Amino acid sequence: MENKALNSPNRQYALERTRNIGIAAHIDAGKTTTTERILFYTGLIHKIGDVDDGNTVTDWMEQERERGITITSAAVTCFWTQKQEEGLYKSFEALSNRINIIDTPGHVDFTAEVERSMRVLDGAVAVFCGVAGVQPQSETVWRQATKYKVPRIAFVNKMDRTGANFENALNDMRKKLGAYAFPIFLPIGAEEAFEGVVDVVNQKAIVWGAGDLSTEGLKYEIRDIPAALQDKAKDALQELIEAVSNKDDVIAEMVLEEKPISAQQLKAAIRRLTCLIELVPVLCGSAFKKKGVQVLIDAVVDYLPSPVDIPCAVGLVPGTTDTVQVEADDRAKFCSLAFKLWRDAYAGKLVFFRDRRASCRERVSLVV
């Protein structure tokens, strides 16, 4: 339910329906490609750009387009309504959501750019290469997210590549990052045979057309889980329930009383733990082959926090050393965090800031 006390009547998307997220990864894990696909499936763009062609939305600098890497963080906003689909329970079905995305650099030379972005995120999608698993910069951005207490979900990308191994990438997260990570989706096939994912919570298979890129990944089928994967899917569900019950009192009590746990109850518990940074849900797919991106967007809405789900920010009272708790509230005085300065050849000096409380209008002077 929306908390109307916190939301201005002029706000088109309630704070509860807003997600402020970042996409972070080691270089070449497919971070910008994933972002581009998200923008396409949410309808912000109508033609998918390519990093190698230098025409993606978030790589806008000339140097980025020439080199095919992200140098500076780029912010973009898109909108997503969870579809009602038979066999799949979703936490916020038929509700429209605003997703503000910051696409961060993956190269080690631009680590500071990631650091300043982490300070203003409510949640993050950590992208991992399905072949290489956890790489050096993966560890760096993970530490930065931990430092700023950013809840995150993980997306194992490039499952279509030769040598892709979902289990190895998952074990990497657990061993190298110390993540309490558990899959909520499993791959169907791997390398050239990768065709879709198993939804562990709903116990359904989601399959995209094999090798058919003409539909741009817009069409997929929801099926029963293939016989060869049914035992694995059941085991993954049981492992997920046990992992959640170790951290969540509601599910723990249901397990002890041997009560059946619905997809709705399990998803609610996963969301609670993700927002508390006590669990990392893990998904998989191939952004380049346009498989698994829609379920990733659903997961952003289902599991990552809104501005009202995170602890209050702590700010300084201007002209003093006193601190103040800043909660998301449209009724209160405007308060924001300036996190980046940029000098533009035409506009001059620009200040990027994150609204922490209330909102501002055009042509209003702010004290920085």
Predicted regions located by residue number:
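Structural and coupling elements of P-loop NTPases
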Residues: M1-R361, L366-V368
